[in-house]
């Protein structure tokens, strides 16, 4: 087994362990969100993550625990909470003692940082702090019965659309960003410049056909699985993972869509309070490892590790006109222009 700890890490951990009395306990996970307690020598890491990450983390966390046990002799257990990204960010910023936050978008990590719980530059870790990528796509049932091929098709009469609520869901904000950005791209192609009014109208016409706004991306996906709606706007990985399990969905990649990047960060105040910094840093490093990135890929995500992405690139299609958050001006501008009380999204909701 290739160690995910550096030599320096192993020395530091060994020194730590010689001063601790170890007890043997079974490795496991829990969804209890209380502050952690652990037997002397053992550790509990608290994970606060967005709902879509759960399936991958169900595989990743036990594997990391086994590696850590082999490296250090120490047993790690996990307390895990999975919520809509915005809800999770507010919980951590409000005092939920997560050691690691794995969320849908960097602006949710920024909320925790602004609340004073993340004190380091989390973007300096790994791939700019991002552990996975995806794109915003549309999903239909087998055979694509409504003939959906691009965003414009979602505006047709009789087409029932699903996506979650951007007030609570980071995935929903990616969905809105994708549709609004596609509207900007279309206006730019027609006139040579971005037209926010056109993009807003484009978003309004799609939203007119929305069947429901669920709390999270996972809740929206569950509704679709129960037969609600004709088409779902979601992460590509949500559909690919289900197709791999034999569910006959169709992935519709729009001409213009957004690159999704999902961050993870250590919550400094909490790891220092719990004495779990070394283990938390090792877990975060593990999430960037080839083993972990392959597990993310198995769950439909696009890896951030170049070697792993090269191995699996045949599993993904490249959109004709892929843009990232910088096309919309970055998250700071997007928060103000789209999601502030006077932003485009709330104007669309209010019919202004």
What are these regions (language model features)?
Residues 1-43:
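Short, low-complexity disordered leader/linker segments with a strong preference
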Residues 27-115, 123-125, 235:
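Early extracytoplasmic/lumenal segment of secretory-pathway proteins
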Residues 51-55, 85-88, 107-110, 143-146, ...:
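Solvent-exposed loop/turn segments at secondary-structure junctions
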Residues 95-101, 158-160, 226-234:
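Alpha-to-beta junction loops
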Residues 113-186:
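A conserved helix-loop-strand patch within extracytoplasmic ligand-binding domains
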Residues 130-135, 200-207, 214, 245-278, ...:
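Periplasmic-binding protein-like
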Residues 186-254:
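Ligand-binding pocket segment of bilobal, Venus flytrap-like solute-binding proteins
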Residues 271-352:
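Extracellular/periplasmic juxtamembrane helices and adjacent flexible linkers that interface
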């Amino acid at each position: 087994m290739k160690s995910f700890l550096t030599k320096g890490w192993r020395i530091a951990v060994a020194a730590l362990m010689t001063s601790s009395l170890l007890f043997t306990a079974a490795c496991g996970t829990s969804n209890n969100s209380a502050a952690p307690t652990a037997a002397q020598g053992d550790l509990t890491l608290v994970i606060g993550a967005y709902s879509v990450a759960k399936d991958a983390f169900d595989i990743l966390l036990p594997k990391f625990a086994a590696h850590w046990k082999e490296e250090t002799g120490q047993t790690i257990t996990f307390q895990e909470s999975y919520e809509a990204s915005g809800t999770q960010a507010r919980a951590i910023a409000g005092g939920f003692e997560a050691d690691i936050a794995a969320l849908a978008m960097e602006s949710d990590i920024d909320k925790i940082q602004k609340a004073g719980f993340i004190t380091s530059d989390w973007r300096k870790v790994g791939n700019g702090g991002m552990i996975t990528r995806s794109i915003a796509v549309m999903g239909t049932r087998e055979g694509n019965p409504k003939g959906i091929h691009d965003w414009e098709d979602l505006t047709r009469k009789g087409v029932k659309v699903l996506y979650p609520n951007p007030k609570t869901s980071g995935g929903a904000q990616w969905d809105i960003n994708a549709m609004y950005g596609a509207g900007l791209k279309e206006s730019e192609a027609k006139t040579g410049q971005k037209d926010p009014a056109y993009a807003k109208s484009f978003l309004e016409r799609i939203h007119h056909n929305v069947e429901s706004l669920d709390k999270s991306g996972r809740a929206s996906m569950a509704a679709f699985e129960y037969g609600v709606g004709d088409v779902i706007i979601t992460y590509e990985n949500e559909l690919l993972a289900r197709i791999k399990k034999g569910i006959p969905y169709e992935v519709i990649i729009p001409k213009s869509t957004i690159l999704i990047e999902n961050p993870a960060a250590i919550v400094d105040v909490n790891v220092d309070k719990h004495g779990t910094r070394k283990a938390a840093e090792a877990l975060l490093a593990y999430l960037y490892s080839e083993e972990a990135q392959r597990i993310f890929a198995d769950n439909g995500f696009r890896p951030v590790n170049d070697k792993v992405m090269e191995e699996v690139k045949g599993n993904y299609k490249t959109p004709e006109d892929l843009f990232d958050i910088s096309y919309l001006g970055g998250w700071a501008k997007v928060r103000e222009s789209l999601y502030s009380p006077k932003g485009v999204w709330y104007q669309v909701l209010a019919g202004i």
